[in-house]
A protein has these predicted regions:
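Rossmann-fold scaffold of SDR-type NAD(P)-dependent oxidoreductases
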Residues: 11, 83-93, 141-145, 198
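A glycine-rich helix->loop->beta "capping" turn
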Residues: 53-57, 77-90, 96-101
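Canonical Rossmann dinucleotide-binding motif of NAD(H)/NADP(H)-dependent dehydrogenases/reductases
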Residues: 2-36
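The beta1-alpha1 cofactor-binding region of Rossmann-like NAD(H)/NADP(H)-dependent oxidoreductases
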Residues: 39, 61-76
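C-terminal helical subdomain
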Residues: 173, 199, 216-254, 258-268, ...
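A short, exposed helix-loop element centered on a Lys and neighboring polar residues
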Residues: 121-122, 182
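Catalytic loop of short-chain dehydrogenase/reductase
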Residues: 93-101, 106-110, 129-191, 201-216
Length: 276
C-alpha cells in the first residue's frame, strides 16, 4: 500500500488511551492502523475516530497479542502492505490477575506487554527504518508506566516465561518495556538508521487496566494520549532516543535502562522466546 500520508500503527487501539491516541494521530494527518483483537471492537473504534476526524484514513489490523503466531502473522501482513511505517506506537497492555498463562505458555502479562511488542517490532522495524531514511521520520514509542520503577528483572524467570504474582509481573513487564526501548535505541543508533525509540508513562488514568489491577480510577483517558502523540509526531524530539518521558518531558527512569549488558541479555532472551 502506498500513501502520501505518514503511517502510524497503534496497538490496543480499541480501548483506553488507544482510541484518543488514534484520534490525535488522524487529526495530524497520519494514516492510522488500528490494532485490536476483534472485528466488532475495531469497527467501533473506527467509528469513534471518524466521529472526531471525518476525513481520517484508517486501516484495521487484527491479532490476539497473547498469541505470538498471530502477532507474527499480523506483522508479516503489515510489512507486505506498507513500504514504510513512520510511528509504531506500542500501546496495548494488560494486568492479568493470578497466574494466567498465554496459549504459548508464558505469563499472560509478560506475553502481551513485552513479548508481543518485541515480536511485532522485529517484524516491522525494517519498515520503520525505511520511513526514517526516506522521510526523516521513523519512531518507536513504547507505553510503559511509572510502575516500572518498582519492577525488577528476573532473567531466569524471564527465560521460564515469567514466575511472579500479578503485580510483580505487571511491574516487571513495564520495566522490560523501558529496557527494551533503551536497548532498541542503542541498536538503531549503532546502525545509524535514524530510527528513534523512547518510552513513557501516560499518567494515572481511568482505564480498564487501572481498575482491574489497582481497583481505582484516574484522570480522563484522553489525557493519557498526550505523551504518546508527542513522541510519535513532534519535531522537537525528532532525534531524541533512549529516553523515558512523563507529561511530554524527559524524566528519570529505572537505572536498569542504562545497563547495556542487561539490555543485551534481555534482548537475547526475549528474541529466543518470541521466535518459538
Amino acid at each position: 500500500m502506498t500513501t502520501t500520508k505518514k503511517t502510524a500503527l497503534v496497538t490496543g487501539a480499541t480501548d483506553g488511551i488507544g482510541i484518543p491516541t488514534a484520534i490525535e494521530l488522524a487529526r495530524r494527518g497520519f494514516h492510522v492502523i488500528l490494532h485490536g483483537r476483534r472485528d466488532e471492537r475495531l469497527a467501533k473504534a473506527e467509528s469513534l475516530v471518524r466521529a472526531a476526524v471525518p476525513e481520517a484514513s484508517i486501516e484495521h489490523a487484527r491479532a490476539d497479542l497473547s498469541s505470538l503466531a498471530e502477532v507474527r502473522a499480523m506483522g508479516r501482513a503489515l510489512a507486505d502492505r506498507h513500504d514504510a511505517i513512520h510511528a509504531l506506537v506500542l500501546n496495548a497492555g494488560v494486568f492479568a490477575k493470578g497466574h494466567d498463562k498465554s496459549g504459548d505458555g508464558f505469563e499472560l502479562t509478560i506475553a502481551v506487554n513485552h513479548l508481543a511488542h518485541f515480536a511485532l517490532t522485529s517484524a516491522l522495524i525494517d519498515r520503520v527504518r525505511v520511513a526514517a531514511s526516506r522521510d526523516g521520520h521513523g519512531r518507536v514509542v513504547t507505553v510503559s508506566s511509572v510502575a516500572h520503577r518498582s519492577g525488577a528483572i528476573d532473567l531466569e524467570g524471564l527465560r521460564a516465561g515469567g514466575r511472579h504474582t500479578d503485580y510483580e509481573a505487571y511491574a516487571e513487564s513495564k520495566l522490560l518495556n523501558v529496557v527494551f526501548a533503551a536497548e532498541l535505541a542503542r541498536r538503531e543508533r549503532a546502525a545509524n538508521t535514524g530510527v528513534t525509540s523512547n518510552s513513557l508513562h501516560p499518567g494515572v488514568l481511568a482505564t480498564k487496566l487501572l481498575k482491574t489491577g489497582f481497583g481505582r480510577g484516574g484522570a480522563p483517558v484522553e489525557e493519557g494520549a498526550t505523551t504518546s502523540v508527542f513522541l510519535a509526531t513532534d519535531a522537537s524530539v525528532a532525534t531524541t532516543s533512549g529516553a523515558y518521558f512523563v507529561a511530554s518531558r524527559v524524566a528519570p527512569h529505572h537505572p536498569s535502562a542504562d545497563d547495556a549488558k542487561l539490555g543485551a541479555e534481555v534482548w537475547s532472551i526475549t528474541e529466543a522466546l518470541a521466535s518459538r
